[in-house]
Amino acid sequence: MRFFAVLLVPLVFAEICPMDKHAICNTGHLSCTCSVSQEDEAPVPEISCNALIARDLETGNFPVVSVEFDLNNSAEALEEFPEDAFRDKISSSLRVDEEDVIVLRTSCVGTDDTLTIQFVILKKDTNSSALPFAIEDLIDAESIATRMKAMGHLSQIANLDVDTIEYTEELVDLEFEPSNLELIFKAILLALIFGFFFVLGVWKLTKKGDEYADDLQKP
C-alpha cells in the first residue's frame, strides 16, 4: 500500500518538475515563454524566447550556457524555478548586470528530478531593444561556462544543487515531447494502480457480504 502512496505523491504535492504551467522568463520587453507545458491548456501568454535570438536558420542552434540542476534534495519547498535568485547569483558571480542575464529555457525535459536552465549574457554596449540578438551581441557562452565551472561556490545556485554546467549550441525544445515508450509505460502504470484499487474494493465488498451472510445464519 505504501508503494502506491509513494507513486501518487508527485500528483498531490506541487514541485518545480514536472511543470504544470507555461513558464515565463525575463521581464519588460524581454519577457518571453521559456517553457511550454502540455498540462496547461491556456494559450501561451508571451512570445517564444526563440524570438530574442538569431538562431541558425538550418539547425535552429544558438550558443548558450546550460545549467542542469538535481532537484532530489534541494527543491522540496519550491513550486517554480526561482529566477530572481538565479539571476542574482549569476550576475554577482560573473560581475555583470542582472538585466543582462537573459534566460531562454527552463525545462524539466520529461523528468521529475532534473531542471535545465539555458541562458546568455548581453555585452555592456548591446542595445537590449535591438532584437533578435546576434552572437556578436553576447558575451561568449563558452567562456562563461568555463568560468562558472571553475567557481566552487556555484555547486549550488538559488538553493538548487548544480549537477552540470556546460556550453552548448543545442537549445532544449520549448515543449517536451515524451517518447511513445514513456507514454505506454505511464499508461500501464496507471492501469495497474487502478486495477489494484478496483480489486481491493471488490474484495472488501465481498468480504463484507460474506460476514453479513454469516451473521444472518447465526441462531
Curated annotation (Swiss-Prot):
Residues 15-182 are extracellular. It comes from the Eukaryota. GO terms for cellular component: membrane. The keyword DNA-binding does not apply. Keywords: Glycoprotein, Membrane, Signal, Transmembrane, Transmembrane helix. Its main location: membrane. The keyword Signal applies. Residues 1-14 form the signal peptide. The chain crosses the membrane at residues 183-203. It is a single-pass type I membrane protein. Residues 204-219 are cytoplasmic. It is found in: Membrane. Glycans are attached at residues 72, 127. This is Uncharacterized protein F13C5.5.
